[in-house]
Amino acid sequence: MRLFPVRFSAASSSMASLAKMLDFYSGFNPSPLSIKQFMDFGQNACEKKSYIFLRKELPVRLANIMKEIALLPDNLLHTRSVSEVSSWYVKSFEDVLVYEKAEPTHDNLQKFVADLDLIRNRHNDVVQTMAQGVIEMKENEGGQVDAPTESSIQYFLDRLYMSRISIRMLINQHTLLFGGNPHAGGRHIGCLDPACDLSDVVRDAYENARFLCDQYYLTSPALEIQQHSSEPGDNLPIRTVYVPSHLYYMLFELFKNSMRAVVEHHGHDNNDTLPPLKVAICKGKEDICVKISDQGGGIPRSQTDQLFKYMYSTAPQPSKSDLHTVPLAGYGYGLPISRLYARYFHGDIVLLSCEGFGTDAIIYLKALSDEANELLPIFNKTSSKFYRATVPTGDWSNQVKYAKKKKTSAVNQ
């Protein structure tokens, strides 16, 4: 097999052993958990049970995505930044394997929590560093990336970042429940809020996005919130079991986009004349929807899908010196990663836009916690084939592009 382009400090026998363990653990599928399972375990938390589960599950999730890293196109895999990310995954995989057969003694349990903290911190900059790797690849290729390579990168980054979200979820739950600073007396179960007030998270995300908007544009649109429930007896505000930080990330990104669109579309008018952002929080039997509606001029339908692509950004690329001061600035990763957060527990983000008027962004969440299961990437023959596949030739006419290339039509003839 092809190992990552990283330098191992251990001998070649250790490299062979690592490859063997990668093959072993990547042969298992990850075990997705539901929000209900996270809650049930957290309410009756047993550190030894969590330790025994994680010492097997974390290597499986790491190995599955590490196998896919090795399948990346060579011109991306061998960039400095991607090599660095690869080395982080190798080190974390080795760190977790230390506990493969270690008994859950008090000392081992304490050391396990400390090592999980180190692993989480080690991977803090995965998103930014991978983005820098893509930039390096594009620069090395003269700014041109062929369609098959772009398709492979889009496919891989969705899976890498979803895997990262899931691994951080497992680590955060364990360290919050059994670390040195648990939420003593709070209602949170690890990073889950069993009664998450959606309108509170909406207001929090709005206020922080508004602060940035006011700083840059000296004005910002107001906020209006409405709440609706399909059950007449439901109390308002609408609450659900969720990870508030995940929802906040999605809302903050969407609010930033909407505020910028509104202010720029309406010519930096005063707050009183800017149309407000309207948020509708709706609870049904199957879905909970949070809809943000703006009057920011909308997006052409041809560009909507592009907004979720990692290789597409309308903003200038950041310099390396800005990498840590302005997280994700210029990479255009906010929307695609927001959608991954929504999809992680089988929700989604959908954009509906009317060009010339405005855009509706809808966050879908599962209303029932036992249906909110993790969506996890699995390494298998299907996924490995994707990296070697070419983009299929279109078998439908594309009238828009066709008209641009060939003005004379059968009708005109």
UniProtKB/Swiss-Prot annotation:
Q: Which UniProt keywords apply?
A: ATP-binding, Kinase, Mitochondrion, Nucleotide-binding, Transferase, Transit peptide
Q: What is its EC number?
A: 2.7.11.2
Q: Which organism is it from?
A: Drosophila melanogaster
Which SMART domains does this one have?
A: HATPase_c (SM00387)
- Please name the top-level EC class of this enzyme: transferase
Tell me the protein family, please. Belongs to the PDK/BCKDK protein kinase family.
Q: A single GO BP annotation from the record?
A: regulation of acetyl-CoA biosynthetic process from pyruvate
Entries under Pfam families matching the protein = BCDHK_Adom3, HATPase_c
Q: What is this protein called?
A: [Pyruvate dehydrogenase (acetyl-transferring)] kinase, mitochondrial
The chemistry this enzyme catalyses reads:
L-seryl-[pyruvate dehydrogenase E1 alpha subunit] + ATP = O-phospho-L-seryl-[pyruvate dehydrogenase E1 alpha subunit] + ADP + H(+)
Instruction: Please give the PANTHER family that the UniProt record associates with this protein.
Output: [PYRUVATE DEHYDROGENASE (ACETYL-TRANSFERRING)] KINASE, MITOCHONDRIAL, PYRUVATE DEHYDROGENASE KINASE
Quote the subcellular location field of this record: Mitochondrion matrix
The record's GO CC annotations read: mitochondrial matrix; mitochondrion; pyruvate dehydrogenase complex
Q: Does the keyword Ligase apply?
A: no
Name all Histidine kinase domain ranges: 137-369
Taxonomic superkingdom: Eukaryota
User: What task does this protein carry out?
Assistant: Inhibits the mitochondrial pyruvate dehydrogenase complex by phosphorylation of the E1 alpha subunit, thus contributing to the regulation of glucose metabolism.
Entry GO MF terms: ATP binding; protein kinase activity; pyruvate dehydrogenase (acetyl-transferring) kinase activity
Question: Would you indicate the residue range of the signal peptide?
Answer: none
> Main location per UniProt?
mitochondrion
Tell me which residues bind ATP.
Answer: 253-260, 294, 313-314, 330-335
